Curated annotation (Swiss-Prot):
Protein name: Malate dehydrogenase
PANTHER family, sorted: L-2-HYDROXYCARBOXYLATE DEHYDROGENASE (NAD(P)(+)) (PTHR43128), L-LACTATE DEHYDROGENASE (PTHR43128:SF16)
Superkingdom of origin: Archaea
Family according to the record: Belongs to the LDH/MDH superfamily.
Amino-acid positions noted as binding NAD(+) in the UniProt annotation, renumbered to this chain: 8-13, 32, 94, 117-119
Catalytic activity reported: (S)-malate + NAD(+) = oxaloacetate + NADH + H(+)
Keyword flag NAD: yes
One example GO MF annotation: L-malate dehydrogenase (NAD+) activity
An individual GO BP term: carboxylic acid metabolic process
C-alpha cells in the first residue's frame, strides 16, 4: 500500500484527497499551513468513509514531518490569481511558496514522485524540480489531462454524444498558449475534422483555451476544482499502479520539439518511475509556432526568477 501526501487543503487539494480515499490506495496525508483546516477536512473525509464504504486512513496536519516516506506527493498549495494581479506577480508569489514546500519534500520524502498542480504550472514545476534536486523524471506537472478533458466535454456537447467516446489531445503550456490538437482528437476513432467544420473546431479550441477563465467568471469567487481533482487522480493512478498510461503531462524536455531545459505540456508515458518516456508528435506549422511562443514565455518566467 502506498503513502500519498497532498500539500494544500484548499478546494483542489481536499477534493483530490476525497477522490483518492475512495480508491483505497493506501494512507493519505493532507497538510496545510492553516491550523485546523486539514485536520477538519480529514476528519470529515474519515466519516464519509463509513457512508461511502472506504477504509482509507486520512490524516490532516500542519507538520511536514508527517509526510515522511511518502511514495507520491501532490502539490496543490499556493494562491490563485486575483483581480489586478499580473502573471508575474502570481509567479513570484507561488515560486516562494513552492520553494518552501519543495525543501520540505526533499527533507522528508526524498524518494517520492512529485506531481505539481500549482500555477503558473510549467514554471512552478521547474521550481519544484530545482529546489528538491530530484531527477527530472520524478517531478512533473498536471495540466494537459485537465485541458484535454475540457476540450472533450465541449466536443461532446457540440456533437450531442457521450464523453466516453472522445479522446481529446492538448499539448503546450498550461494557459493562453496551450495547443489543442484536432487532428489527434477522435470520436470513436474518427478524426474530429471529419465530423465538424473548421470554424466550429476553432470555436471549441478557443473555448478550451479559456476554459478555466470561463469557470472563474461564473463563480465570481474561486476557481475550478472538480475537474482539476479528477485530472490529478487520473495522473496519480498511472504512477501508483505503474500502468504506463500515455497522458498529456508537463514534462522536462531534452530536445523534443526543439526545446531543452524547460517543463512543457507533451505526451508522456507515466509509471512508477514518473515520466518514463516523452512522445513527440508531428504538428502543423501554426501549432509549432504557438509551441515556440509558449516555450519563450516559460523561459522568460524562469529567467525572471533567477533560477
Amino acid at each position: 500500500m502506498a503513502k500519498i501526501s497532498v500539500i494544500g487543503a484548499g478546494n483542489v487539494g481536499a477534493t483530490t484527497v476525497q477522490r483518492l480515499a475512495e480508491l483505497e490506495p493506501g494512507e493519505i496525508v493532507m497538510t496545510d499551513i492553516v491550523e485546523g483546516l486539514p485536520q477538519g477536512k480529514a476528519l470529515d473525509l474519515m466519516q464519509a468513509g463509513a457512508i461511502n464504504g472506504y477504509d482509507t486512513q486520512v490524516t490532516g496536519t500542519n507538520d511536514y514531518a508527517d509526510i515522511t516516506d511518502s511514495d507520491l506527493v501532490i502539490i496543490t498549495a499556493g494562491i490563485a490569481r486575483k483581480p489586478g494581479m499580473t502573471r508575474e506577480d502570481l509567479m513570484k508569489t507561488n515560486s516562494k511558496i513552492i520553494g518552501e514546500v519543495s525543501r520540505n519534500i526533499a527533507e522528508y520524502a526524498p524518494n517520492s514522485i512529485v506531481i505539481n498542480v500549482t500555477n503558473p504550472l510549467d514554471v512552478i514545476t521547474y521550481v519544484a524540480m530545482k529546489t528538491t534536486g530530484f531527477e527530472t523524471k520524478k517531478v512533473f506537472g498536471m495540466s494537459g489531462v485537465l485541458d484535454a478533458g475540457r476540450f472533450a466535454s465541449f466536443i461532446a456537447e457540440e456533437l450531442n454524444c457521450s464523453k466516453k467516446d472522445i479522446e481529446a489531445m492538448v499539448i503546450g503550456g498550461h494557459g493562453d498558449l496551450m495547443v489543442p490538437l484536432p487532428q489527434y482528437t477522435t470520436v470513436s476513432g474518427i478524426p474530429l475534422p471529419e465530423l465538424l467544420p473548421e470554424e466550429t473546431i476553432a470555436r471549441l479550441v478557443e473555448r478550451t483555451v479559456n476554459g478555466g477563465a470561463e469557470i472563474v467568471g461564473l463563480l465570481k469567487q474561486g476557481s475550478a476544482f472538480y475537474a482539476p481533482s479528477a485530472a490529478i487522480v487520473s495522473v496519480a493512478e498511472a504512477v501508483l499502479k505503474d500502468s504506463k498510461r500515455i497522458l498529456p503531462t508537463s514534462a522536462y524536455l531534452e530536445g523534443q520539439y526543439g526545446q531543452e531545459g524547460i517543463y512543457f505540456g507533451v505526451l508522456a508515458k507515466l509509471g512508477a518511475n514518473g515520466v518514463e518516456e516523452v512522445l513527440e508528435l508531428k504538428l502543423e506549422e501554426n501549432q509549432y509556432e504557438i509551441l515556440r511562443k509558449s516555450s519563450e514565455t516559460i523561459k522568460r518566467g524562469i529567467s525572471k526568477l533567477g533560477i
